């Protein structure tokens, strides 16, 4: 377990503080250019709202291949232990810091309006101040809780998570490396496909239509039929 005392960064304007405590060597390793695209998770302790402490939380970076190595845009994805889900509900949450353009702020305002209008399908987000392992990443951010996952699906639809959900994605191929031959996240090549019939082989769909739930079933029949 880790703790921090009187660091002077806590929000005093009503924002919820979300502290992520991590060993400096591991944080530095995670942010190396050759490591930022790894989805391997490292251990952290999370302190929520200066009261609730979560141990053995596993964290990776969150953003695009260009954003993860950008201190203004990089975010975090945290997975909580099965014995201590976040706020008693969520096995994972994400923190979005990517305020690089005004479009991001517009999207956030739509999320807030939809969530508070009642009777509409919406994600559940919250404003926070993230106190990150590295001070340069400490700032206001968006805490993404019930994203388009099982908690969201079951809350909005009867037996919602029984179905299959896919996320359209592009494939990014690094085009450069450091002196040791380790790939760097950019520059890169980008490949995609149109939403069209790719045949009956699910491997043609796997990396363009990422399976977002019920992964153990490895079922791509719905997207193939679509």
Which ranges hold each PLM region?
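Regulatory N- and C-terminal appendages and interdomain linkers associated
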Residues: 1-56
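Extracellular/periplasmic catalytic domains that process cell-envelope and extracellular macromolecules
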Residues: 10-14, 37-39, 68-72, 86-89, ...
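Short, solvent-exposed loop/turn and secondary-structure capping segments
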Residues: 31-34, 57-58, 68, 89-91, ...
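Soluble non-cytosolic domains of exported or imported proteins
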Residues: 36, 72, 100-108, 213-221
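Conserved oxyanion/phosphate-binding beta-strand-loop segments in alpha/beta enzyme cores
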Residues: 40-99, 212
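Structural recognition of the beta-strand scaffold that forms the well-ordered cores
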Residues: 55-58, 75-79, 92-97, 104, ...
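Internal "kinase-insert"/substrate-recognition segments embedded within catalytic cores
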Residues: 79-87, 97, 119-123, 136-226
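A conserved helix-loop-beta module that forms one wall/lid of the active-site cleft
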Residues: 98-133
